[in-house]
From Swiss-Prot:
Pfam families: BES1_N. It comes from Oryza sativa subsp. japonica. Residues 102-120 have a biased composition (Low complexity). Residues 1-24, 69-126 are annotated as: Disordered. Belongs to the BZR/LAT61 family. May function in brassinosteroid signaling. The lineage of its organism: Eukaryota, Viridiplantae, Streptophyta, Embryophyta, Tracheophyta. This is Protein BZR1 homolog 4. Residues 9-93 are annotated as: Required for DNA-binding. GO terms for molecular function: DNA binding; DNA-binding transcription factor activity. Keywords: Brassinosteroid signaling pathway, DNA-binding, Growth regulation, Transcription, Transcription regulation. Signal peptide: none annotated. GO terms for biological process: brassinosteroid mediated signaling pathway; DNA-templated transcription. Residues 90-101 have a biased composition (Polar residues).
């Protein structure tokens, strides 16, 4: 059921129970405080009182006066009505009965060279109202000096707005403010001077030389493309200016088939040379799907060629790896002996 006063949600039973328990605890603590003040202190507290009555009693004992509207001040030092009206919105003024004494004007942690540029926040006398105009003039002149290049220093009496302080504004020491250091470009200018005609960064040139050295000396399980090797060799031979050819080796050619199953159905070329071709021309052929045949640009050494080539008919080539039974396709009968019979009871013996 919604409350008549507002349109908020209805608190649950657990929330209502927590609120009741919290309120009972608060009232029990307040009752003990009131009982102690009545028993052990000179406090005139009514039987049913709230926190305001306790605060009034404590202020009276401390020598303060609390009026019915809540105005509180020391006894015998009642401030004027105009000052009481401005207590909430303005800073308190110096009073002989006030416990808050503002710091005297003109004091600052840094010596100020210009006294006319100080700004007093929170109001003051009539003579201080005209100090804003010189400060704005100083600020505008300082901005022109910074933007136009005639002066790169802030004035020594540059004022800052304090965060709620009513004392004199804090001024920085009479020195130039910290300046962002200029980026050092000597190394880049030197490199640009020596490599004026190159359009590639240093890592490209180094990468080209390393790619050529790796492709010519280090063994690789995936053989590089001849186009990439030629580009790397040209990049290493031409230096930094011709290193663009090395990057050209990374371009993907669109002339080849885009189907991922092309390499599975296309018959791979025979990279093992004429000897393996002659040995594989018998009735037993090699399976292209199971044999370790790579792409068309594979270049194998003679030792690896002799070590990993399959044996031919009758084992003519010694030292070769013998193909296991599943690697070879046995053709026991010729193609003319094969016949497709569909639902016929005739057999080869009946013919």
């Amino acid at each position: 059921m919604m409350n008549g006063g507002g349109g908020g949600r209805v608190p649950t039973w657990r929330e209502r129970e927590n609120n009741r328990r919290r309120e009972r605890r608060r009232r029990a603590i307040a009752a003990k405080i009131y009982a102690g003040l009545r028993a052990y202190g000179n406090y005139t507290l009514p039987k049913h009182c709230d926190n305001n009555e306790v605060l009034k009693a404590l202020c009276n004992e401390a020598g303060w006066t609390v009026e019915p509207d809540g105005t509180t001040y020391r006894k015998g030092c009642k401030p004027p009505a105009s000052e009481l009206a401005d207590q909430l919105g303005r800073s308190p003024s110096a009073s002989p009965c006030s416990s808050y004494q503002p710091s005297p004007r003109g004091t600052s942690s840094f010596p100020s060279s210009g006294s006319s540029s100080q700004i007093t926040l929170g109001g003051g006398g009539g003579g201080e109202g005209s100090s804003l105009i010189p400060w704005l003039k100083t600020l505008s002149s300082a901005g022109v000096g910074i933007g136009g290049g005639s002066s790169s220093k802030f004035p020594a009496h540059y004022s800052y707005f304090g965060g709620g302080s009513i004392s004199a504004p804090v001024t920085p020491p009479s020195g130039s403010p910290p300046r962002t250091p200029r980026l050092k470009t000597a190394a880049w200018e030197e490199y640009h001077h020596h490599h004026a005609g190159s359009v590639l960064p240093p890592w490209a040139t180094v990468g080209a030389s390393y790619a050529y050295a790796a492709s010519s000396s280090l063994p690789n399980s995936t053989p590089p493309s001849p186009r990439r090797k030629v580009a790397a060799a040209a990049a290493a031979a031409g230096g930094g200016n011709d290193a663009a050819a090395w990057l050209a080796g990374f371009q993907i050619s669109s002339a080849g088939p885009s189907s991922p199953t092309y390499s599975l159905v296309a018959p791979p070329p025979n990279p093992f040379g004429a000897a393996a071709a002659a040995a594989g021309s018998s009735s037993r052929v090699m399976s292209g799907a199971c044999s370790p045949v790579a792409g068309g640009d594979v270049q194998m050494a003679d030792a690896a060629r002799r070590e990993f080539a399959f044996g031919g008919e009758g084992g003519k080539m010694t030292g070769l790896v013998k193909a296991w039974e599943g690697e070879r396709i046995h053709e026991e009968c010729g193609s003319d002996d094969l016949e497709l019979t569909l639902g016929s009871s005739m057999t080869r013996g009946d013919r």
